[in-house]
């Protein structure tokens, strides 16, 4: 099930080209923390707790960026990125991987799947916001 997180009044901190962000992680506490980081920065945030749920949300609505875990049961983050890249309107949407995977091979696989950036957990809020701003700006 997808949930919306309220954006705060810090809209001046976000770039005009990136308003709606989808956050995806199978760990609800991580999903909620990432969504909180983004909403405090002024973004409108939707949350999904699986890659399949995120793909359904992307088909149903438009997101300006997607922040996704990689290691999820069922459809994983790599598969989600590939599916999103094949979805009309998502060919150039910024996709950011947030993961506990730390090897260079993981980073390379993420790029091949369609991710634009790759951040290691635990996530530093400023690193996440910088990545979103860089890709959306």
Predicted regions and their residues:
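Active-site beta3 strand of CheY-like receiver
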Residues: 62-67
């Amino acid at each position: 099930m997808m949930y919306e997180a309220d954006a705060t009044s810090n809209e001046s901190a976000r770039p005009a080209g990136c308003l709606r962000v989808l956050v995806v992680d199978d760990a609800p506490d991580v999903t909620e923390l990432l969504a909180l980081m983004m909403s405090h920065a002024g973004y409108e945030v939707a949350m999904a707790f699986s890659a399949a749920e995120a793909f359904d949300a992307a088909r149903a609505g438009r997101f300006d960026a997607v922040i996704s875990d990689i290691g999820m049961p069922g459809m994983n983050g790599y598969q989600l990125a590939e599916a999103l890249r094949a979805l009309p309107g998502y060919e150039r949407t910024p996709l950011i991987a947030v993961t506990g995977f730390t090897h260079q091979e993981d980073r390379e696989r993420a790029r091949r799947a369609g991710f634009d950036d790759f951040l290691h957990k635990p996530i530093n809020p400023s690193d996440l916001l910088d990545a979103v701003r860089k890709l959306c700006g």
